[in-house]
Amino acid sequence: MNPQRRRRLWLVLALVLAGGLATTLVAMALQRNVAYLYTPAEVLRGEAGEHARFRLGGMVEKGSFRREAGSLEAHFRVTDGDAQLPVRYDRILPDLFREGQAVVATGRMQQGVFVAEDVLAKHDETYMPKEVADKMGSAHRKHQVAPAKVTQ
């Protein structure tokens, strides 16, 4: 093999290795920052992972909101119609946050409580993220009872 071909071969190998390394680093960075969306029922079944960072989607349960006196710390429950999960958040809540409204919170589970780092609220229940609507819809369909048959 002549020196020019050998140099080209080393250059091609170096480029392939650099491309592979760059792809690996990008994939690792993306995987670390991905937060999957789960409903309360899925979290309680253990699908989210014990120490994983994830998004929790559902509706703020009516009558569940309370705020610690003299503090920003808020406590509320998120429900998907199937299960409820307590949430703790210690920052300023969005202006659109209300009981009975759709919410998506990002955070981690700690001792049975979802500790939110970020909370997004929707202005009414007619719009919610497609993933949350689909998951809540399946929970609601699961609980519907077939109409009774009338016998004569």
From Swiss-Prot:
Pfam families: CcmE
Molecular function via GO: heme binding; metal ion binding
Transmembrane segments: 9-29
Protein name: Cytochrome c-type biogenesis protein CcmE 2
UniProt similarity note: Belongs to the CcmE/CycJ family.
GO cellular component terms listed in the entry, alphabetical order: plasma membrane
Gene from which this protein is expressed: ccmE2
Species in which this protein is naturally found: Xanthomonas campestris pv. campestris (strain ATCC 33913 / DSM 3586 / NCPPB 528 / LMG 568 / P 25)
Residues binding heme: 123, 127
Location within or outside the cell: Cell inner membrane
